[in-house]
Amino acid sequence: ARLLWIMAGNRPALRSLVRLLGLAYTRGDHKKALALGEQVLRLNPFDNHGMRHTLAEDYLGSGDADACLRIAAAFPDDPAPELRFNEALALFRLGRAKGAIDALKRAHQMSPRVAAFLLPGRVRKPQLSDLGVSLDGDDRAWLYRDAMREVWKQTPGALEWAKKMLG
């Protein structure tokens, strides 16, 4: 079954699932949250809620590089760092060096500001707007760093490798 966002009558059900997902995260039930996120993606494969970004981060953060790659592969044209930089890190974790290098360079081409925020040990937090996040600005790069730098740090050699590849 599909519940496409474009159909206004489907929106209450999709919103309810996303709210349940938020509650699962709040309660610390990440397994339930991941299952709900996957359900939202199955029902609405165009992913108007951006579940793909959350799922890619959470799968990689929990050590499931293959699941992160599955999500990234389903949205090959999405330039979001949550997909592209996480794809590179997932490939690096799996020891797929050539794919990791290609993915990292592609991620950097799509979101060139991310490396400037992700790779240094310390960076100044940019001004964040109450109105939203820019597609490829310092704010988006900062938010990616804030969400994922620890995951990069926990992957032995990943930050050093990325610095070398992008240096």
Please report, for each region that a protein language model flagged, where it lies by residue:
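TPR-repeat structural position
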Residues: 29-30, 65, 97-98
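Long, ordered, amphipathic alpha-helical scaffolds
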Residues: 89-167
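Short coil/linker segments at helix-helix boundaries
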Residues: 1-28, 46, 52, 106-109, ...
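Residue-level signature for tetratricopeptide repeat
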Residues: 16, 22-24, 56-58, 90-91, ...
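Catalytic phosphate/metal-binding cores of nucleic-acid and nucleotide-processing enzymes, i.e., regions
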Residues: 20-29, 33-38, 42, 58, ...
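Solenoid-like repeat scaffolds
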Residues: 38-45, 71-81, 105-113
